[in-house]
A protein has these predicted regions:
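N-terminal, active-site-proximal structural segment of metallo-dependent hydrolase catalytic domains
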Residues: 2-8, 20-81, 92-98, 279-280
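Active-site beta-strand/loop signature of hydrolases that rely on acidic residues for catalysis
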Residues: 26-34, 53-78, 104, 142, ...
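Acidic/histidine-rich helix-loop elements
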Residues: 31-51, 96, 120-134, 161-164, ...
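Solvent-exposed loop/turn segments at secondary-structure junctions
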Residues: 34-37, 71-74, 92-96, 109-110, ...
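Short, solvent-exposed loop/turn elements at domain surfaces
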Residues: 36-43, 67, 113, 165, ...
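Solvent-exposed, acidic/flexible segments
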Residues: 43-50, 67-72, 97, 135, ...
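Structured beta-strand-rich core segments of catalytic domains in phosphoester-bond hydrolases
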Residues: 64, 68-154, 252-256
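Metal-dependent phosphoester-hydrolase catalytic domains
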Residues: 166, 170, 180-189, 197-280
């Protein structure tokens, strides 16, 4: 009797250890257009939003966070308010002022092996504006090594122009070229950010063979969007994405976070949060 009991306890222990190891391989990724700090937002200004927004981020505690529209002081305030993260990314304007598409990496989970920023233009290595864009636009990236298993991956975070149709199309082509050049060994890649493009647009068709939209994959038929504009709790304008290399990852969960504590908008976008795992 005791031998049987000990045998089943042993099997249960092995199962629990295996389950715990599998879970430890997973990591969370979040993309968040935090809305720039601008006086015309009135009650929704950054000063009113930053404390609850930081509380939201620190509660979720993502392993990788990509933000858009972050001005230099917002990047600094986020970094100060998020212990245990390293920040990557610079502003898009002269002297690296202006909005950043920044990344925050949890240092207890990942080692940053490479990082940088390029401009979405014909001269990506220079501060510049591309095609018919209304603004300078950037993409910041990191190459990460997982401290738990040594696996490596890339993360690219971007914010496409809100006006220029050609700029949005060319931005995607440029980013895919940059990924190919920087990642010749085809390591797993995450591409995320505010694309200012809805899912049905033809420009995104180029991603369908090699990439997976994490939210769409696990929430087929969902009509919930990400751009709330500070005025609708259930938007249908989906423009914020987390894409992953199709063959490289398992997706465990993906959701749009719609918290609105005490009726306070945290941003004019909802963040997208996905939990993924690099395949063996």
């Amino acid at each position: 009797m005791w031998k049987k009991r000990n045998f089943f306890i042993g099997i249960l222990g092995v199962f629990m250890l295996a389950k715990g190891w599998a879970q430890s391989e997973r990591f969370s990724v979040m993309t968040y257009n935090i809305r720039l700090d601008i006086a015309s937002d009135g009650v929704n200004r950054w000063d009113n939003r930053k404390t609850p927004l930081l509380h939201q981020i620190n509660t979720i505690h993502p392993d990788v966070l990509g933000v858009q529209e972050a001005l230099p002081h917002q990047m600094t305030e986020l970094h100060k308010g998020m212990p245990g993260y390293q920040k990557v990314g610079v502003g898009r304007e002269e002297n690296y002022t202006g909005e950043a598409s920044g990344l925050f990496i949890k240092t207890s989970r990942f080692i940053i092996k490479d990082s940088g920023t390029f401009w979405l233009s014909r001269t990506p290595e220079k501060i510049s504006r591309g095609w018919d864009a209304a603004c300078n636009r950037v993409c910041s990236f990191v190459r990460l090594e997982d401290r738990r298993n040594g696996k490596q991956c890339w993360v690219f975070n971007t914010h496409w122009d809100h006006v220029g149709e050609q700029a949005r199309t060319e931005s995607l082509a440029l980013i895919l070229t940059q990924i190919a050049v920087r990642n010749p060994t085809n390591e797993p890649v995450i591409l995320m950010g505010d694309f200012n493009t809805t899912p049905e647009h033809p420009r995104l068709k180029v991603l369908e063979n090699d990439w997976v939209n994490t939210f769409a994959a696990l929430n087929p038929g969902s009509t919930l969007g990400t751009f709330n504009g500070f005025h609708t709790d259930t938007p249908n304008n989906y423009i914020d994405y987390i894409w992953i290399s199709r063959q490289a990852f398992t997706i465990h969960s993906s959701e749009i976070r719609t918290e609105k504590p005490n009726h306070q908008w945290l941003s004019d976008h909802y963040p997208v949060l996905s939990v993924v795992e690099i395949k063996p």
